[in-house]
Amino acid sequence: MITSIFGKVTFVGKRKIIVEHNWISYWFNTKENHKFEKNLEKNKQIFCHIIKKIVANQIIEEAFAFNTLEEKEWFCRLIELNGIGSKTALNLLNNDLEEIKQYILENNYSALCGINGVNNKIARALLSLEIFEKSENNKNIKGVQVADGYDELFETLKSLGYKQQEIQDALKMIEVKPDFDISQLVAEVIKLMSFKNNEITNKTA
């Protein structure tokens, strides 16, 4: 599989670039805050990944370009996760990857949910991302358990009639541990939401 090519960047758009390689021009999809610059004189190393899919009995290829090998590796890992496609993966690359990695290692589900473009399902998928060393497998298991706790808590509160946004705001203020007690967590979150609602009421009174 091709890891990178050397070519001239002949066009730079918001989420696409054109690279000329061996007298052939290729379209590449990119993340929004990429650092590619147009240069018709010098060849540049472009880290790339090709996705092939069948659409209407035809093989369609999509090419993606990255500034660094690290970005390419993250993209390849992300698209292997359930619920994360190429578009979502590119959006995630717009964030601080070291920050995301740290949140994953800390099993910090609520912090992941606070990242731009990350919802509950994506945060859960990220916690299962295999960026851990073999000696840290136990952390990975705990991360999944914590994600299960947040999911159960979210669904329980939603069934009680609370709005999605107020639930998400409250979840960012609590910590779920692997040995969580769902009834205690529900009571804690309801208390937080009630306190917040009272604050809003007092300010508007």
UniProtKB/Swiss-Prot annotation:
SUPFAM superfamilies: RuvA domain 2-like. Residues 150-205 are annotated as: Domain III. It is found in: Cytoplasm. Keywords: Cytoplasm, DNA damage, DNA recombination, DNA repair, DNA-binding. Pfam families: HHH_5 (PF14520), RuvA_C (PF07499). Residues 1-67 are annotated as: Domain I. Disulfide bonds: none annotated. Transmembrane segments: none annotated. The keyword Transcription regulation does not apply. Disruption phenotype: Not essential, it can be deleted. Its main location: cytoplasm. GO terms for molecular function: ATP binding; four-way junction DNA binding; four-way junction helicase activity. GO terms for biological process: DNA recombination; DNA repair. Residues 68-146 are annotated as: Domain II. One of its GO terms (cellular component) is cytoplasm. Residues 147-150 are annotated as: Flexible linker. The RuvA-RuvB-RuvC complex processes Holliday junction (HJ) DNA during genetic recombination and DNA repair, while the RuvA-RuvB complex plays an important role in the rescue of blocked DNA replication forks via replication fork reversal (RFR). RuvA specifically binds to HJ cruciform DNA, conferring on it an open structure. The RuvB hexamer acts as an ATP-dependent pump, pulling dsDNA into and through the RuvAB complex. HJ branch migration allows RuvC to scan DNA until it finds its consensus sequence, where it cleaves and resolves the cruciform DNA. Has three domains with a flexible linker between the domains II and III and assumes an 'L' shape. Domain III is highly mobile and contacts RuvB. Homotetramer. Forms an RuvA(8)-RuvB(12)-Holliday junction (HJ) complex. HJ DNA is sandwiched between 2 RuvA tetramers; dsDNA enters through RuvA and exits via RuvB. An RuvB hexamer assembles on each DNA strand where it exits the tetramer. Each RuvB hexamer is contacted by two RuvA subunits (via domain III) on 2 adjacent RuvB subunits; this complex drives branch migration. In the full resolvosome a probable DNA-RuvA(4)-RuvB(12)-RuvC(2) complex forms which resolves the HJ. Belongs to the RuvA family. This is Holliday junction branch migration complex subunit RuvA. It comes from Mycoplasma genitalium (strain ATCC 33530 / DSM 19775 / NCTC 10195 / G37) (Mycoplasmoides genitalium). The lineage of its organism: Bacteria, Bacillati, Mycoplasmatota, Mycoplasmoidales, Mycoplasmoidaceae.
